[in-house]
């Protein structure tokens, strides 16, 4: 979470590219994924986002990164409802959101940081933040997988560098 997995994915991609590899996917547990190039028979890599029923269950990913953030609950005792692992810095308390945010952008580090940031912010404020990242797209999903909001089309298969 945060930016750690995104940074690790980005570094792995840099190492692969430095070794001359032009086509690859690095997947760090479904929530942080980056791709370069494409498989021989497609324009991009098919990536399952694990959000069935939204039309976003599987997208084509090429030369970009994707990150998903949602509030998990960590129980502290048997029968406890649990506490969230993402903290709202303005309140100093766990985020109460049941939303999942998925961000797509070239940099895996930025994707990871943005998806967590957008989970904390109100949607309209999050969209304003995204305006500072011209290549970024995002989707906010409800706990039942319904699309609440979208900023640009996250399904676009390729992103310009």
Question: Which ranges hold each PLM region?
Answer:
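Mature catalytic core of soluble alpha/beta enzymes
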Residues: 1-161
